[in-house]
């Protein structure tokens, strides 16, 4: 009979590697992706390594409430709270998408006390690329 393979890193063992929470990050980039259904806020360092992230879904909002401005504000506050504790003082903001949470997320970032170098809209715009889907008839 074969021997059972020892399970390395099962769910009960918890996290195997240590989290990089001890790093000091003075400057970073805050990416806000605001769709009509959800808002995702990702905070990275200057090299692009993800330091913290949050979304309206992980903050406990479900269904259509995930696309609301209040959900975006909560998600931005959660993502930024951890990096402010790690010492972030300056940040650049990249906003992508047409969602309702764009302005609310930016307002929450401004209120957090981080100095913003610039705010840039990086929503992808086609230069007459693919044909869009047909219009809905309700």
UniProtKB/Swiss-Prot annotation:
Top-level lineage group: Eukaryota
**GO CC annotations on file:** chloroplast; ribonucleoprotein complex; ribosome
Compartments where located: Plastid, Chloroplast
Q: Where are the transmembrane segments?
A: none
Extract one GO BP annotation from the record: translation
Return the similarity comment: Belongs to the universal ribosomal protein uS11 family.
Q: Which gene encodes it?
A: rps11
- What is the protein named? Small ribosomal subunit protein uS11c
């Amino acid at each position: 009979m074969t021997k059972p393979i020892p399970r390395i890193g099962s769910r009960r063992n918890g996290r195997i590697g240590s989290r990089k929470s001890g790093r000091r990050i003075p400057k970073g980039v805050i990416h806000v992706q605001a769709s009509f259904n959800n808002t995702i806020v990702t905070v990275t360092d200057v090299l692009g390594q993800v330091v913290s992230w949050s979304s309206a879904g992980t903050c406990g909002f479900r269904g259509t409430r995930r696309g609301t401005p209040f959900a975006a504000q909560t998600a931005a506050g959660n993502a930024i709270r951890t990096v402010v504790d790690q010492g972030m003082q300056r940040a650049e903001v990249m906003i992508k998408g047409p969602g309702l949470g764009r302005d609310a997320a930016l307002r929450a970032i401004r209120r957090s006390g981080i100095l913003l170098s610039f705010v840039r809209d990086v929503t992808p715009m086609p230069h007459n690329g693919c044909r869009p889907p047909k219009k809905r008839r309700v």
